[in-house]
Amino acid sequence: MTNFIPSLTDWHALHALSITMLDLAHSGKWDELIEQEMNYVQLVEGIARNPISPGNTFLINQAKEILNAVLRNEAELKTLLQHRMEELRQLIDQTGKQQSVSTTYGNLAGNILFPSNLNQ
């Protein structure tokens, strides 16, 4: 016989972890957020392995409420991650431009440009 109580415990743990991950994202602690992702996946897998008894409508309704809260947190987290990806994309673009400028000026090192050369 399957023990259904731990499954609801896992639901609560999943919700708590989703809040923690959201807090980490709001704080800009991206490395810590990534570290928590594996725990999140493991909790989801645990929930999938230990479903709530179909006849227990009380627990099913509680799980639905928790799931809705988790999904709201995931949607907000996804938005924050998209903003972070855009920030990183801009940093990468900026770094590429800086390298291009450095390379160009590096190629001109040792060359002296005189104003008379500009009029020709």
UniProtKB/Swiss-Prot annotation:
It is found in: Cytoplasm, Cytosol. Keywords: Bacterial flagellum biogenesis, Chaperone, Cytoplasm, Repressor, Transcription, Transcription regulation. It holds the Pfam family FliT. One of its GO terms (cellular component) is cytosol. GO terms for biological process: bacterial-type flagellum organization; negative regulation of bacterial-type flagellum assembly; protein folding. Residues 1-50 are annotated as: Required for homodimerization. InterPro entries: FliT (IPR008622). Residues 59-97 are annotated as: FliD binding. Belongs to the FliT family. This is Flagellar protein FliT. It comes from Citrobacter koseri (strain ATCC BAA-895 / CDC 4225-83 / SGSC4696). The lineage of its organism: Bacteria, Pseudomonadati, Pseudomonadota, Gammaproteobacteria, Enterobacterales. The gene is fliT.
